[in-house]
Amino acid sequence: MNIGSFVTNEKETYGIFFDDYAQSVTDNFIREYRNLREVIERKSTPLMYENALSTPKLKHNKIKFLPPIVNPTKIICIGMNYHKPYPVDGKSLSNPENIILFGKNSEALLAHNEILEIPAGDASDSFDYEGEIAVVIGTQARNVSVSNADDFIFGFSAFNDGSVRDWQSHSIYAGKNFSGSGSWGPWITPLEDLTDLRDLELTVFLNGEVVQKATSNDMIFSIQEQISYISSIMTLNPGDVIATGSPDGTGASFNPKRFLKAGDDLEIQVSNVGSLKNYI
C-alpha cells in the first residue's frame, strides 16, 4: 500500500495512496504522529493503514501532492552509478572504484505534478534531468553489512536529481541544489510490496519520448552496497532518502544537448512503484 504526504482543504496531512485516490489519516492520528517520518520511525504503518482506511476517498486531482516525506534528515545522492559518459563534458570514463556521494537539500526538491523552477540567468542554459530510483530508510542503520542491508529499507520512490551542468562542472553541490530544480514522489511503495529489488525498472520520458531506461540490476554498486557504504560513514535514520544514481540518456548526453526548457513535460517511472510527473 503506497504512502505519502499531501494537502487537502488547505491542510497538510499524510496517508495512503491508490491508483486514483488517497485517504488521509485523522486529526487524532496526526496529534500522535506529527508526520510520516515519525510513523516510519515508530514502526506504525499498520496503525496508519487502519486509520486512513476509515476516512473519505480523495481523488488525486482534488489534492496537492507533497514530497512523500516532507522533513527527511538526509538526502544522499549517488554519482556515476551506471556506465555512461560523464554528463558535464561527455568524456567516457571507466567505472568508479568507490561509491561517489553528494548531498541534496530538501529545498531543491518539489513534489509530483509541480512545475520545476527554471534557474535564473545563465544557469537556465544547462538545466538537466536525471531520473533515479530512490530508497527510503526504515530502520536506523550504522555499519550495516551488504547481506543485511535489505532489513533497513522501508520502501522506494521515483526521483529527479535536477542538475545545472555548467555549475556542476565547478561545484557538484552548487549544480545539484538549485531551489525547486528536482523532485521526488509521487509516494513511497513499501519494500514488502515488491518482489525483486534487482529488477526494478527505471524509465524516463521527456515530452512522451523515452530518454532513459535501465534496471536496478544495471547499477555499478547495488542498493545494498550503497546502504552498507553510507552507514559505514554516518548513521542513516528512518525517513532518510538515497537517490541511487542515473543511467545514460540525460539531456547532456545528446548531441545537440537536450536541456530542459519551458513547456517540457517530464515523467520518471519506476516499475511497481509509480510515476513522478513534473512540468517545466
Identify the function of each model-found stretch.
Residues M1-I99, E209, E267:
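N-terminal non-catalytic cap/leader segment that marks the start of a structured domain
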Residues G4, F65-P67, V88-S92, L116-F127, ...:
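A generic local secondary-structure boundary/capping motif
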Residues V7, K104-S106, N113, A120, ...:
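Short, structured patches in soluble enzyme cores that scaffold and shape functional sites
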Residues T8-E10, Y49, L53-L58, P85, ...:
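Catalytic-pocket segment enriched in acidic/His residues
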Residues L93-H112, Y129, K261-N272:
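Structural signature of FAD isoalloxazine-binding scaffolds in flavoprotein oxidoreductases
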Residues P96-E97, L101-N105, N148-S179, N217-S222:
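Flexible glycine-rich active-site/ligand-binding loops centered on an Asp-His dyad
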